[in-house]
């Protein structure tokens, strides 16, 4: 069984994807982490994430970089969004994701284009979203808990900028697959969102 989970930044898709993978006993890949590693590798080598050649060179990152705590920062998240617009970068990372999706044990992948590009044959495709203001508030609250001084307006502006890049790129834009199940987490608690996601997946599996 393959489950594809897509959605914009701070929609809650990562939390839901991990919970679904645990519930259904599937290997899990956070594909966004790969793009963050590319962005971080470019940063560490003083490259330009907006330059296709520098971004492509960033794909040659060591596996150890996937354990770098900096990958989870807002700054590196922004770099990931910037390198991901380059078709060369997406092509370089696609094979790793496709191979993971097609392993015999099944898989759950979370990203931006899993249901549309990486695993269009997935048994279940879930598109997780929430209003930009709600996503910005979540990110703001998270950063406040970690003692990071930031303005809500700046977080919201960054969310809008990332959405525009993700949805507007020519290659594999962020959008729900035609047969994706839509889940808006805007008014849901984490527990409520997890239960709703499990129910949606189980409902689709019963019909297939």
Where are these regions (language model features)?
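ATP-dependent small-molecule kinase phosphotransfer cores
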Residues: 33-106, 116, 133-137, 141-145, ...
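Conserved lysine of the Walker
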Residues: 13
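Phosphate-binding beta-loop-alpha motif at adenosine-nucleotide cofactor sites
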Residues: 124, 174-190
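Hydrophobic positions on the alpha1 helix immediately C-terminal to the Walker A/P-loop
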Residues: 16
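P-loop (Walker A) phosphate-binding loop of NTP-binding proteins
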Residues: 8
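Post-Walker A helix-loop "phosphate-sensing" segment adjacent to the P-loop in P-loop NTPases
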Residues: 21-31
